[in-house]
């Protein structure tokens, strides 16, 4: 239609725009204001008060965690043609305990915990496991199946254990307000594609982790920083926050 006459299509479009605008406008009513914001419940950790330190530790390094290490270590021993490794769950628990002790009682080598000299020997370690058995488990201990490699994950060798720890952290978390996320460094001086150097940090060399924590320091979730994956995330920074995968 020519001239000043408006087409039916234009009239329909104008009517639609007016209807949309009227829907978006708030409808005000008179009355007293009532606060509708509910109070977030406080976390209840009373069930952990009667637990020992060992019991709490087992909430995270649980039976499933230990059995997975046993199965994968036996699998790797078979891969190396050692059919009689016979690694047990109790041995894996003892092995982990020795690793914890070695973090506090630092010696030039692991063999020194069984040294004949009293100034080197650690009786708690030497009486819990034989030296040769410990070194054998060191050779066989494995966290994942070598036939199932994820080329996109630099942490594939420990990914199953990381996922189990994440599940345990989530299961034992009591929801609360004021969670925060930030970077955390795990000291490491060896060679790995994920090792970082951050100048000005108390721990300059090691693995950088994205962590979600409560105000009291409880670790809710975590993820290892991997540059390739991080670059993919940064390409979407206008749409997603960097540590979106922690939620």
Predicted regions mapped to residue ranges:
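N-terminal initiation segments
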Residues: 1-245
């Amino acid at each position: 239609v020519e001239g000043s006459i408006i087409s039916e299509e234009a009239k329909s479009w104008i009517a639609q725009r007016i209807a949309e605008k009227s829907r978006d406008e708030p409808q005000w009513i008179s009355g007293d204001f009532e606060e509708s914001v509910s109070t977030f419940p406080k976390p209840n950790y009373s069930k952990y008060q009667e637990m020992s330190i060992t019991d709490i530790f087992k909430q995270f390094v649980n039976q499933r965690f230990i059995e997975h290490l046993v199965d994968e270590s036996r699998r790797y021993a078979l891969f190396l043609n050692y059919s009689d490794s016979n690694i047990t769950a109790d041995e894996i628990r003892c092995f982990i305990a020795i690793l914890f002790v070695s973090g506090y009682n630092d010696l030039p080598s692991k063999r020194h915990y069984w040294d004949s000299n009293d100034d080197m020997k650690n009786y708690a370690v030497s009486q819990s496991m034989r030296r040769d058995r410990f070194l054998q488990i060191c050779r066989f201990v494995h966290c994942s199946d070598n036939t199932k490699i994820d080329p996109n994950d630099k942490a594939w060798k420990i990914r199953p254990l990381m996922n189990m720890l994440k599940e345990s952290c989530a299961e034992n978390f009591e929801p609360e307000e004021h969670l925060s996320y930030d970077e955390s460094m795990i000291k490491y001086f060896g060679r790995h594609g994920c090792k970082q150097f951050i100048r000005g940090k108390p721990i300059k060399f090691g693995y950088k982790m994205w962590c979600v924590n409560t105000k009291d320091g409880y670790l809710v979730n975590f993820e290892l920083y991997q540059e390739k994956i991080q670059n993919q995330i940064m390409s979407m920074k206008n749409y997603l926050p960097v540590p979106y995968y922690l939620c």
